């Protein structure tokens, strides 16, 4: 069987729980070979974001050229893009290199609430990037920002917003319902073929740093093995639930700790 080569385009996390570091751990845990393009150097830890150094857009583009000119990339995950010019650079290179099977994690805020995407970049993300990607994975605040609409408070409002996002041109939308006040944590998958609800009990842990990064990376790593996004999401969510269930066995940081990416091994 041909090995999967997976690319992550994202910012860093020195504490290892989110961003590029979480993506590469996820790829490895799920049997994919990980490549990376860095968009921002982020001084952050389990307590929050202290500082962000944005990489020059031309250098982001150069990194992408280096990878795509040499490595067969089977699947790509996009995370933190930080600002308008970086969004534009990534969108242009995806088009130039005819990149397919792209998962976009619409990263706007860190778990701590610190901003990771400038407000001016949201429109560029919406217009230039969304039509090129295969799947987006917004939580409810991110979906509201993309739609310039109020935050969904009910599952019915969540459904309406998911359908509106799908109409923007991407192949599929996985709306994450973790912000709903529900004992279950419902997610909804929207595709051209239909809609699918995923529900699982909330895992009782405070250590959820990097869950969005980890889920989107898992979706990217697993997609080439499955026939559709529904099958992919089922496996990715089950794997993430196990990583969350083992998060408390780690002892990382004083704040919101990471999930356990390698729970199957140690």
Language-model-derived ranges and their functions:
Residues 119-195, 235:
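Conserved phosphate/ATP/ADP-binding segment of small-molecule kinases
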